[in-house]
């Protein structure tokens, strides 16, 4: 697959591709929200509204089939950009046995390990050592050159032991890893001033001895410039890169949460703006896309999402009485469990 981020960062094709992933993810997640509120989805629904610019830029900057990407719960845009088909998402949330989780998880823990996307771990921060381990394994196999491993976390995850251990190991080993911190100002409902004492999370980069970047996560052009540079430095041997994106999630922690703890002052502030609307203006103002093109994309993606939802709704859900438990049997002989 073509790597648009290679060479000229402000590439027209690159930016259009990023925006398309942002838009496709937003339309998909709006549909998921409606399905959840209608009682069609069992379990939680976690959206990436307001964080699409960061997520889609990273997913587009990585090379499918070569790089590794461990997405966060709010990374539908990045998943889409990295090649995950929409049907994987709708099948998972709607419990289809045809989905990547075979109906066993109606949530966001799916992955595409064969394509370099490990399954998402709910304990945020835990994917930092996972990506470090995947990269280290490739070094031991002699196939690390030219690869990058990336993951996204939230501001709260920077307080975890897994984040510290994983980033410290990656720094010592000079692994080509990019960690994107989406600082949406609240770790669930815990504000930044109760989460860390430094003025800016990017200051942590100096302590670990890794590259550090800070970017306005609501600005597509800024995200494209900074994230592509971080990926480039990691790929060229510069070691781990920490990118802190300042933004605000535009919904609650999940669709079960109204986010009442976020003040109107914060919501109406600079980072409360919608990155999709910002990106749309940037594309049009810089003659990278027309209003008619964007309208056509919206219509196309809405139809694509509707088809994916309809297909998943027609498919069977798991039948526990006829479950063969092959997920366990592929690793351990089923007779061992029976004997015990």
Predicted regions and their residues:
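Cofactor-binding active-site loop characterized by glycine-rich and histidine/acidic residues
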Residues: 30-33, 40-173, 191-197, 202, ...
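Phenylalanine-focused residue identity feature
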Residues: 4, 14, 19, 68-69, ...
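Short, well-ordered beta-to-alpha junction loops that form the rim of enzyme active sites
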Residues: 73-74, 245-247, 317, 325
């Amino acid at each position: 697959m073509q790597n648009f981020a290679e060479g000229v960062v402000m590439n027209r094709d690159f930016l259009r591709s990023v925006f398309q992933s942002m838009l496709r993810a937003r339309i998909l997640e709006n549909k998921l929200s409606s399905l959840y509120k209608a009682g069609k989805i069992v379990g939680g629904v976690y959206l990436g509204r307001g964080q699409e610019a960061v997520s889609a830029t990273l997913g587009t900057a990585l090379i499918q089939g070569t790089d590794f990407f461990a997405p966060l719960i709010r990374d539908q845009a990045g998943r889409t950009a990295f090649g995950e088909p929409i049907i994987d998402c709708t099948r998972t949330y709607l419990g289809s046995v045809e989905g990547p989780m075979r109906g066993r998880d109606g949530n966001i823990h799916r992955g595409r390990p064969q394509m370099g996307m490990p399954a998402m771990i709910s304990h945020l921060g835990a994917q930092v050592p996972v990506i470090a381990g995947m990269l280290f394994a490739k070094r031991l196999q002699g196939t690390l050159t030219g690869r990058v491993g990336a993951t996204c976390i939230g501001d709260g995850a920077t307080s975890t032991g897994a984040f510290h251990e994983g980033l410290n190991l990656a720094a010592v080993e000079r692994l080509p890893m990019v960690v994107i911190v989406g600082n949406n100002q609240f770790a669930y409902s815990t504000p930044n001033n109760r989460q860390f004492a430094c003025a800016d999370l990017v200051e942590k980069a100096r302590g670990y001895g890794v590259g550090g970047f800070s970017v306005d996560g609501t600005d597509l052009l800024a995200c494209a410039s900074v994230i592509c540079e971080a990926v480039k430095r990691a790929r060229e041997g510069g070691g781990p890169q920490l990118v802190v994106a300042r933004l605000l999630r535009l919904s609650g922690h999940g669709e079960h949460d109204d986010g009442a703890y976020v003040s109107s002052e914060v919501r109406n502030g600079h980072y409360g703006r919608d990155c999709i609307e910002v990106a749309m203006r940037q594309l049009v103002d810089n003659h990278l896309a027309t209003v008619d093109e964007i309208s056509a994309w919206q219509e196309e993606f809405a139809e694509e999402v509707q088809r994916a939802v309809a297909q998943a709704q027609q498919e069977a859900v798991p039948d526990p009485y006829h479950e063969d438990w092959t997920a366990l049997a592929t690793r351990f002989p089923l007779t061992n469990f029976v004997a015990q």
